[in-house]
A protein has these predicted regions:
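Thiol-based oxidoreductase modules, predominantly thioredoxin-like and allied folds used
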Residues: 32-42
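Short helix-loop-beta junction
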Residues: 25-33
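Structural micro-motif
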Residues: 49-56
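Short acidic active-site motifs
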Residues: 41-44, 73
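Non-catalytic, surface beta->alpha helical segment in thiol-disulfide oxidoreductase systems
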Residues: 61-79
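Local sequence-structure signature of Cys/Sec-based thiol-disulfide redox active-site neighborhoods
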Residues: 1-25
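Generic recognition of short, well-ordered alpha-helical segments
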Residues: 18-21, 51, 69
Length: 79
């Protein structure tokens, strides 16, 4: 099974931190082999065409931006 790459895009705001914590919790609950990284570089964020943060990127694909999903919703996005 391949390692899941999770990126949290955002400047480090409270919602960004919440999304990071929830995404990590969801990945752990699912038993995924994963790497998670916070990305604050605006050039990288804009490269994903994300205009509102926080955003969740899984294996290079933007799954959600501009809101913080629940852990249950994140589990669906990660599985």
């Amino acid at each position: 099974m391949n390692k899941t790459r999770i990126e949290i895009l955002g400047p480090g705001c409270a919602n960004c931190k919440t999304l990071y914590e929830r995404a990590e919790s969801a990945a752990r609950d699912l038993g995924l082999d994963y790497d998670i990284e916070k990305i604050a570089d605006m050039d990288v964020i804009l490269g994903y065409r994300v205009m509102s943060t926080p955003a969740l990127v899984v294996n290079g694909r933007v799954k959600v931006s501009g809101r913080v999903p629940s852990v249950a919703q994140l589990k669906e996005m990660l599985s």
